[in-house]
Design a protein with these regions (language model features):
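Bacterial N-terminal signal peptides
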Residues: 14-23
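Bilobed "Venus flytrap"/periplasmic-binding protein-like clamshell domains
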Residues: 32-33, 38-58, 117-176, 181, ...
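Extracytoplasmic small-molecule ligand-binding "clamshell" domains
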Residues: 32-97
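Periplasmic-binding protein-like
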Residues: 33-41, 112-122, 202-243, 249-272
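Short helix-initiation/N-cap motifs at beta->coil->alpha
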Residues: 67-79, 165-177, 216-218
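Acidic, polar ligand-binding/catalytic clefts
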Residues: 76-134, 143-147
Length: 273
């Protein structure tokens, strides 16, 4: 029975070695992946599953990329802390807040309707009496609470002593509709969304007025950590060219963008000042 026993020992060892090798391959292939972490303070994107699936399918054509969307700023920041083999997709407001702490460099910015800079506005109903000083009432917004409050405070410069009550909605257009249908007192949205509403529903938009305007800001930013190990030029190039083919264009539409553009010195200065 010795040869048989020896054969079984050999077989068991071989099987274990194979399992070990497979595990090693699986783990190391996971390690070699370049993650693209996405979190936007400006949109309330809730179709994460399809977003991840669509982006992974598209990016896999170019190499070991993996798309990871987040719905929470805290979780996103914990995840990217200390990571070098990743790219970050985040709003310009968020980038300005964390770029020093996380040693980030901006590479591209997203264009919406062909425009690099967007303006945020506060819209209210034309017939609503001037909002009582101190009590702003309900604000509809598709942006994160932190970003909404920060932007409103700088727009109104401390005019309201009470904090803003925010009604979170999926999209900017929903925020505007909320005011149109009397569900909220004010809407915090992009100027481009209001222009869109004027086209879709001129009657509803004519009942609304712009109450405050913010400064022009860049949209979504693609940023790299300073110690990025991959081929940064190749990676940036791949993202930048997404709008060149129908597949890529469809994916960036899911982020509310129509193309990417490189940042110039003036953009960087504004972003990092």
């Amino acid at each position: 029975g010795h040869p048989k026993k020896r054969f079984f020992t050999f077989l068991t060892t071989a099987v274990f070695l194979l399992i070990g090798l497979l595990l090693f391959c699986v783990i190391s292939s996971g390690e070699g992946k370049i993650k693209i972490y996405f979190y936007s303070t400006e949109t309330n994107i809730n179709n994460f599953k399809s977003l991840k699936m669509e982006f992974d399918r598209y990016l896999s054509k170019f190499g070991p990329y993996e798309f990871q969307p987040f719905s929470s700023r805290d979780v996103f920041e914990k995840q990217v802390k200390g990571k070098e083999n990743c790219l970050l997709l985040l709003s310009s407001w968020h980038y300005s807040n964390i770029h020093q702490k996380y040693a980030l460099t901006p590479a591209l910015t997203g264009l919406r309707n062909g425009k690099k800079y967007q303006k945020r506005i506060v819209v209210t109903s034309r017939k609503s009496a001037d909002i009582v000083a101190g009590k702003p009432g309900l604000v509809a917004s598709a942006s994160s609470l932190q970003y909404t409050n920060s932007a409103l405070n700088s727009m109104f410069q401390g005019k309201y002593t009470h904090p803003f009550k925010v009604l979170t909605v999926p999209k900017d257009i929903d925020a505007l509709m909320s005011v149109g249908f009397g569900m909220a007192k004010m809407a915090f949205a992009s100027e481009s969304a209001f222009d869109e509403l004027k086209l879709i529903n001129p009657r509803l938009s004519s009942k609304m007025k712009v109450m405050a305007e913010g400064e022009e800001t860049l949209g979504l930013i693609l940023a790299l950590p300073q110690g990025f190990k991959g081929n940064s030029q190749q990676t940036i190039h791949m993202i930048k060219n997404m709008s060149m083919d129908a597949d890529g264009k469809r994916r960036i539409r899911m982020l509310g963008l129509d193309s990417w553009q490189e940042l110039d010195a003036a953009d960087r200065l504004k972003l990092e000042s």
